[in-house]
């Protein structure tokens, strides 16, 4: 039953006794008295088959070298005898292992360990469960049924029996450890891929969506739309995805106002000439509305938005939120009436536009309140425009404003710092550059400078800074990019 395949690959576990350990680690083990070379019951788990053979040959060499005199022989005759006796003892030990009843089971689990080490673990691979530990349990049950009817498990040599059992146990533990390592690797790969998908740049996600997008959106004009979308790279369906999460709060209401104003933050393109109303009976129109719901206003009017880049969209949205936060009370209530907010702020602004009043009910449910309460913002704005000559409160005034608004002194302080930089300073620059004050007053302003600023403030109330008409009336007013953050 000799199998040369396992001649050099098998390692024995627990076959050797104390004499074998002495022969392996002690060079003078062959010279010990025979009384110290008894075989204890303990089996070392690290002894190899070759070490056991060397130990056995060492014992034979001791007796042959000692002769009948009882004295240890010289080292060189024993070494010569060992060189000639190793092949015979080695062959006898190999035969004892190969002919053991448990050897087929040992060879089976050894092959399973090899397969578990080198086989790729993919869910679609056929036969991937052949090298699992559970399959080995089935193999043990089947093997026990077969061998029970033929011959017993153990032989007359308890040392070889112990070697086989412990070798099978060690390989079984090794198979379980391999499975655990594979499970940990699979878990790590799954979590790592999920993390990468969560942190993937949004432009890659948009490109992936564009690749999966159907090439045809309809017949006739649908083909023209798809060609224009592929060249513009600013499709309305992907525009909300380009914006960061912080700027997506105003999506749904403020964007529609901007879309209805001609050229507000947009670039005229081939798709800007669309019918004012969408025919709901048109199946192509329904399909387009389902793809691009952001292009329709709340009452169904078609409004196509095209920005030259995502940065322009963010700048226009930031300017809109600044306008609503400064002049309308809070950054997330852009659809409310301008007249009511301005009257609460004690600023002469005129009546709000009818378009804003129409959209108030539709946007009220889509918006969230800002960081500061609306009443507190109105109080702070009223104080600011009442003290434009020195638009910064003292410590006592800060405390009083904090009590009136319910804010902390630090919040009041930060609000006035931002307001002085973003509201008052542009107004002062506009007043100084305007050729409107022939008689400067004692404070550097003209006699009518305050009225001029208040009138200009009233005109600015009617449209957000992102509107080009806003900058046509006030050429020196900072552009929309100036308002990177709302107050």
Curated annotation (Swiss-Prot):
Keywords: Developmental protein, DNA-binding, Homeobox, Nucleus
DNA-binding region residue numbers: 365-427
Protein name: Homeobox protein homothorax
SMART domains: HOX
Region (Disordered): 25-49, 210-292, 333-369
Phenotypic consequence of gene deletion: Severe head defects, including a failure of head involution and transformation of the thoracic and abdominal segments into a more posterior identity.
Transmembrane regions: none
Family statement: Belongs to the TALE/MEIS homeobox family.
Localization per Swiss-Prot or TrEMBL: Nucleus
